[in-house]
Amino acid sequence: MLQEFLEIEELKSIHEEKLRLMEREMALSTPLLTELEYIPMLYKWYCELSGCCEESGGLNANQKGQFLLIILFFYSPITLVGGRIVNGVRDRLAKLFGFNSPSAVSNLRDAISFYETYKGYRKTIDQLRDEFMSRLKENGIIPQNPIL
């Protein structure tokens, strides 16, 4: 009989921990940006900061992957851990990149493994993301101290 009560207490503890983890996941996966109208502005910033420009024929696959990661960080952080891309983001990026289908954007998700594997790639993305964050704060688009 004592064992059954101990198991119920353990079950209760597990349930409480799952609720706490779900709340934390929700907080961490909440996007900093939700308004898709900012994506072209962010693209312009990316072109400026990375040294690429539309006159040179647009972005190569590596640059598109970098920009995608930055967009996912701001608009769909859950995607960076295997979740789905937030509705509307793929369509906007497909149009921006000149893709015929939004599914082509999903093919760029290899950039996530590049980010995890290659230190130089990660450093570049982190620097760009930090600069974007500074500019978004300066422009009042996100609060000075967002909850992460």
Predicted regions and their residues:
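General nucleic-acid-binding
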Residues: 1-48
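Short, amphipathic alpha-helical segments that act as regulatory/interfacial helices
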Residues: 16-19, 23, 68-75, 109
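Short, Lys/Arg-enriched N-terminal segment that forms or immediately precedes the first helix
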Residues: 45-59
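Short, amphipathic alpha-helical "recognition" segments used to contact nucleic acids or chromatin
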Residues: 61-88
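Short alpha-helical "recognition helix" segments of helix-turn-helix
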Residues: 82, 87-101
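Major-groove recognition helix of helix-turn-helix-like DNA-binding domains
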Residues: 99-116
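Short Lys/Arg-enriched helix C-cap and helix-to-coil transition segments
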Residues: 115-138
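Helix-turn-helix/homeodomain-like alpha-helical modules used for DNA recognition
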Residues: 145-148
